[in-house]
């Protein structure tokens, strides 16, 4: 689904939802926008000029992701160091089960090797070599480059070129010279195609991931940008005067003309994490477990002491890339997850594939004949057949019943409703185990608030919270558009990374240590200048730009480094060095405890970065006066039969839009809105606070 959330200057918001249209994402975007405008009562004729009222528009889409999934990007040629022509097909063992469930991870036959974006016949090796210190060992053979360029650009008619040489992150002269030769060949051939260099796209170690990053940029960035331009054009037709913005994987907003657009390839779930971080700053909770239930996947991340960790080598569509991304883990467990019976064991098998939003659950009668989790929600009475997406989508409960009986219940020899509840319990167990086993290892769950969002988040939140002793459990009425809302909570941000290797021994004198870290300072200064100039060119004023140097540090001999925002701008004295390494040690002991800290350890700086930010106006959470505990009459919609714990019960039904801050509700209940549904089991109690946030506690623990 495509969600649009409109936030006004008072912090009020409204959510619109529409089916995603992958062939032209502007269609789904505009339909969702118009639905939101209808909801707040903007007349049709005024909607055609509503763009004049928009200060900014931010789009977090899956254009680049879809391009890679569907293998519909540019025909890309690869020029690389001779002997490394197969680098596009190479990889690491663990990339064969990225995002898979544990059952797939533990069985080799389920593992899948991706199809390379660059086929072997479009890869050319050229003679050159730079060593690990940046020294030229073999000068580049320019005639090799010219021949490779001619074969790829002229003979093969490639639509883009990726250039990836060994050690180019230390010394980029060979890649830049190769690009000059390619442009000359391109000019002679009368063509104009993008040429991407790994030293510009991802100047960091991990050569296979660096190559993948450059190839994805060359393969998918321009096709994805065309989708973004379509959305911008549609907005301008209704009076929007600014440029469309998009979200980058590390939680920043940027112009859609941003050159390294591949950094936005994995931004689909970032909005939710950033929205959770902002929400936490308002309510005063900086330890949050974020859980997003969509149609296809269950995504989870952890905010620890207000910090969202960044993964510099995330998995992306069966490969690893060098692109900073907020840490988030996913499994194929959403409301559209397919339910099948394994013919060998006669057991229930959930996913990992999904109907998603198209063709959707069987009850939508759009061609899908495999039952999904949402069919279970409908059969059990949790979802209202007359209120699916506010009643805009036709639902046929009988179709859902018949297909579920035929394909799930009868093979199991179970009653339809018993089988449906069993499937729901299995899904909730999968979600709970995913959070506790992969996210909260080493953390005390009692210190964390569990936040549920996404269209299916409130629907499954309390069942997968289970008996785990979270500090609190909460959701929001705009959960269905929470990730979109999170986009409005982000600053405008760019960041640049560069690999380095600097070792600081505690026995060094101040002069020796300052001299050793001089390369760090030099790279910081260079990255600062690049980012500053980028933002100035985009129209920002110098006083708006905040630049933060970052160092990635570990103890010598250890495998994992930590991101340390530097409290100082340079490293010219012992005080500067102490400030940086003290910040590292504080972070290290916070994550791994004081007992893990080696005494007198040698520091190893493995990578440096600079983050450039421009603060934006954030949505404001309005404080309301608290009403009576009892919900108003217009919020109470009677009861509905609901199957729970092997029997039918009468559940209280409430209209979410009419509930007020201060209201309290006991389970068994269903609180439904047009874009989401909150299911409240019998053992839970709901309280709405002054910010209209829904807090859930087990009865007896209020």
Task: Report residues per predicted region.
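Gly/Ser/Thr-rich loops at beta-strand to alpha-helix junctions
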Residues: 1-2, 59-64, 166-175, 270, ...
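Glycine-rich phosphate-binding loop of actin/hexokinase-like ATP-binding domains
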Residues: 4-7, 16-23, 27, 77-83, ...
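Glycine-rich beta-strand-to-loop/alpha-helix junction loops that act as flexible
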Residues: 60, 164-167, 198-200, 249-250, ...
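C-terminal, non-catalytic interaction/recognition modules in large multi-subunit enzymes and RNPs
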Residues: 143, 147-151, 155, 233, ...
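Terminal amphipathic helices with adjacent charged low-complexity linkers/tails
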Residues: 162-214, 218, 387-388, 566-568, ...
């Amino acid at each position: 689904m495509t969600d649009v959330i409109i936030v006004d200057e008072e912090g009020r918001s409204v959510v619109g939802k529409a089916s995603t249209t992958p062939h032209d994402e502007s269609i789904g975007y505009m339909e969702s926008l118009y639905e939101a405008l209808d909801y707040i009562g903007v007349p049709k004729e005024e909607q055609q000029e509503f763009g004049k009222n928009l200060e900014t528009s931010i789009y977090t889409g899956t254009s680049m992701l879809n391009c890679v999934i569907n293998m519909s990007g540019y025909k890309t040629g690869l020029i690389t160091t001779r002997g490394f022509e197969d680098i596009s097909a190479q990889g690491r063992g663990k990339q064969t089960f990225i995002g898979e469930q544990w059952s797939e991870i533990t069985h080799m036959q389920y593992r899948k090797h991706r199809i390379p974006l660059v086929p072997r016949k479009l890869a050319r090796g050229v003679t050159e070599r730079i060593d690990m210190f940046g020294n030229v060992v073999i000068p580049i053979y320019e005639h090799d480059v010219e021949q490779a360029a001619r074969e790829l650009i002229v003979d093969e008619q490639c639509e883009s070129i990726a250039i990836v040489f060994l050690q180019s992150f230390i010394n980029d002269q060979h890649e830049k010279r190769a690009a000059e030769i390619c442009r000359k060949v391109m000019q002679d051939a009368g063509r104009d195609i993008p040429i991407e260099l790994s030293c510009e796209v991802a100047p960091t170690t991990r050569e296979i991931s660096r190559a993948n990053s450059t190839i994805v940029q060359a393969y998918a960035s321009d096709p994805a940008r065309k989708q973004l331009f379509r959305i911008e054009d549609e907005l301008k037709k209704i009076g929007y005067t600014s440029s469309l913005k998009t979200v980058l994987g590390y939680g920043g907003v940027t112009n859609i003309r941003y050159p390294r657009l591949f950094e936005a390839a994995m931004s689909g779930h970032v909005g939710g994490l950033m929205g959770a971080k902002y929400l936490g700053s308002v309510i005063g909770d900086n330890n949050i477990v974020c859980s997003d239930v969509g149609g296809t996947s269950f995504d989870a991340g952890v905010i620890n002491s207000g910090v969202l960790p960044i993964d510099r080598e995330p998995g992306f569509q069966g490969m690893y890339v060098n692109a900073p991304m907020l840490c988030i883990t996913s499994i194929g467990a959403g409301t559209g997850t397919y339910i099948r019976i394994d013919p060998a064991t006669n057991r229930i098998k959930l996913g990992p594939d999904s109907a998603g939003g198209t063709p959707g659950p069987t009850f939508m009668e759009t061609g899908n004949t495999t039952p999904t989790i949402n069919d279970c929600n409908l059969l059990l009475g949790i979802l209202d057949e007359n209120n699916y997406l506010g009643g805009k989508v036709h639902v046929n409960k009988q179709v859902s019943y018949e297909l579920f009986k035929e394909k799930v219940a009868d093979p199991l020899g179970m009653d339809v409703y018993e089988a449906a509840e069993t499937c729901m319990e299995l899904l909730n167990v999968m979600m709970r185990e995913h959070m506790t086993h992969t996210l909260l290892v080493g953390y005390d769950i009692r210190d964390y608030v569990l936040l549920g969002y996404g269209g299916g988040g409130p629907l499954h939140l309390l069942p997968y919270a289970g008996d785990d002793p979270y500090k609190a459990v909460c959701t929001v009425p705009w959960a269905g558009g929470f990730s979109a809302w999170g986009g409005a909570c982000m600053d405008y941000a760019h960041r640049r990374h560069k690999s380095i290797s600097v070792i600081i021994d505690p026995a060094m004198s101040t002069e020796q240590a300052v001299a050793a870290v001089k390369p760090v300072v030099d790279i910081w200064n260079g990255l600062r200048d690049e980012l500053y100039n980028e933002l100035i060119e985009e129209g920002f004023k110098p006083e708006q730009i905040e630049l933060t140097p970052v160092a990635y540090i570990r103890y010598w001999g250890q495998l994992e480094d930590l991101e340390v925002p530097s409290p100082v701008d340079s490293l010219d004295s012992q005080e500067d060095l102490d400030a940086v390494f003290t910040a590292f040690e504080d972070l290290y002991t916070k994550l791994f405890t004081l007992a893990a800290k080696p005494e007198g350890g040698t520091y190893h700086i493995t990578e440096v970065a600079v983050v450039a930010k421009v603060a934006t106006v954030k949505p404001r959470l309005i404080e309301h006066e608290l009403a009576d505990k009892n919900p108003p009459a217009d919020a109470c919609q009677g009861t509905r039969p609901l199957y729970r714990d092997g029997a039918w019960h009468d559940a209280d039904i409430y209209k979410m839009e009419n509930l007020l801050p201060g209201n309290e509700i006991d389970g068994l209940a269903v609180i439904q809105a047009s874009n989401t549904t909150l299911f409240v089991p019998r053992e839970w109690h709901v309280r709405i606070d002054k910010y209209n946030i829904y807090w859930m506690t087990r009865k007896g623990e209020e």
